[in-house]
Amino acid sequence: MEIFMPKLRSATSTQGRNMAGARSLWRATGMKEGDFGKPIIAVVNSFTQFVPGHVHLHDIGQMVVKQIEAAGGVAKEFNTIAVDDGIAMGHGGMLYSLPSRDLIADSVEYMVNAHCADAMVCISNCDKITPGMLMAAMRLNIPTIFVSGGPMEAGKTKLSDQLIKLDLIDAMIQSADKNVSDSDVDAIERSACPTCGSCSGMFTANSMNCLTEALGLSLPGNGSCLATHADRKQLFLDAATQIVELCKRHYEQDDYSVLPRSIATKAAFENAMSLDIAMGGSTNTVLHLLAVAQEAEVDFTMADIDRLSRIVPCLSKVAPNTNKYHMEDVHRAGGVMAILGELDRANLLHHDTKTVLGLTFAEQLAKYDIKLTRDEAVKTFYRSGPAGIRTTEAFSQDCRWETLDDDRENGCIRDKAHAYSQDGGLAMLSGNIALDGCIVKTAGVDESILKFTGEAIVFESQEDAVDGILGGKVKAGHVVVIRYEGPKGGPGMQEMLYPTSYLKSMGLGKACALLTDGRFSGGTSGLSIGHCSPEAASGGTIGLVRNGDIIAIDIPNRSIQLQVSDEELATRRAEQDVKGWKPANRAREVSFALKVFGHFATSADKGAVRDKTKL
């Protein structure tokens, strides 16, 4: 019986007499005679000098290229765009952040399919780059390994003779607090972001890079090993070597188990979401996982997230949910593998799912969970720590903690019996104001306000909300409603980090709630409820709220209700139908590119992906 092996995709442009022109062009890129017939592997880099999470990636792409070629492949590098959400925050630039995710996915698809690449190493890091590349990987379904740029070291400075840890969010909050002196604000600003890498807390970038480990698409340690540490160099080299091995297994041995869709199954998405809930990750991960699942044609929905959020405990609290721990502390405690290990011991992990190492998670945890491993090299790897030296250079230091943090009772990562809470770090709420659900990061909510009822104060834009908060219009007991900021209504679904930060700086962090059809930065904490679906621009009930309406929030019972009668809501809906569901008195310049995004965008419960029914 004749066996037909998968043919190299690149053979389309490298084999046969009629491809002489294409081969001539390949030769002009540096390919030699012996290279034709080898797998062509795309090194998908995202270097830019605009973003600290990517500023150190310039030479890393070529390092990966050389290692791929040493392992027997042909490597070709290209770059994607990368938006820094922190720099784009608080002005019109934030409208472009979420749309950039889809643009990145499209651009990777375009480059890889146009040039018939056989596999990818995706070098991502910050908020929309990792999910955009994940979406592309699922579309393309060719051998792919993710290796990110790594987390930033936590900032440290002395205030009132006390050494404190800092991050970007501290700079935002303290700068708006009139009780903080100019000299202290200056010290915080200069110390909050000391190195290259993705911001040092469990914000969106680090959350997503951790989730690539749980999906099985990156190597152990990818989510937590610092950008500045020499150990991270080996992750890049190992990824480069392993991608050639995956190509051999697929194209020479007919092994389809190495493909992204075979690895990132429904069970893998559940593992990733369970990790996110356990570590109190960014609410943006919900949006992105839903989008990636759709590209993978996996039936993973808000209902699955709701189910998992009710059974998975909160096993790790990291900034912004606490000031005590940052990503460098998560790594010292064993990183993602340690959290997954605790989930496995609690029977909350599908440990038969596969990874890019060709192992099941049960096998991978046996080697990489610091509570199980006998490999001293693994333990040494997880002792890698910060140097405390300002730098934009990758792999520039090799400092190590003297000991690991393997305390599962009182340490950074806990076991289920000693969890920060038996209720997980994320929750989906639903009710008449959010028929398709909304998301809250419960790990960042003070226990005193898990149930909250208050009067609505409504704003038609983030800008108006900021003015209202800083201008004293928002009072204790208010539910701040910011609407028409969803994927369609923004358009672009801005992050509401400044409103939540300013509530804290005004002393209202535990005295108010915030509800929006927009989204939040991974740096947000407090009673901040986002992704309200359907959004106002799509006829969602959030568009019917009026000042003074009572909104009741009950996180333990996963409920959020607008206490207005159905009859009154029907009357308001009829009025709004006539008005066309547009924000009142909002002056906002919207480019053609953003209008196109808004036209096709679905609400957050669908991942804000494009509505294919409109094609």
From Swiss-Prot:
Q: Which cofactor does it need?
A: [2Fe-2S] cluster; Mg(2+)
Cofactor details (free text): Binds 1 [2Fe-2S] cluster per subunit. This cluster acts as a Lewis acid cofactor.
Q: Which residues form the active site?
A: 521
The GO terms describing molecular function are: 2 iron, 2 sulfur cluster binding; dihydroxy-acid dehydratase activity; magnesium ion binding
Q: Which residues carry this modification: N6-carboxylysine?
A: 128
- According to the UniProt entry, what is the EC number of this protein? 4.2.1.9
Instruction: Note the InterPro entries from the entry.
Output: Dihydro-acid_dehy_C (IPR042096), DihydroxyA_deHydtase (IPR004404), DiOHA_6PGluconate_deHydtase_CS (IPR020558), ILV_EDD_C (IPR056740), ILV_EDD_N (IPR000581), IlvD/EDD_N (IPR037237)
Cellular component terms (Gene Ontology): cytosol
Q: Where does [2Fe-2S] cluster bind?
A: 126, 199
Class of the enzyme per the UniProt entry, highest EC level: lyase
Q: Which pathway features in its UniProt record?
A: Amino-acid biosynthesis; L-isoleucine biosynthesis; L-isoleucine from 2-oxobutanoate: step 3/4; Amino-acid biosynthesis; L-valine biosynthesis; L-valine from pyruvate: step 3/4
The entry's family comment says:
Belongs to the IlvD/Edd family.
NCBIfam families linked to this entry: ilvD, PRK12448.1
What name does this protein carry?
Answer: Dihydroxy-acid dehydratase
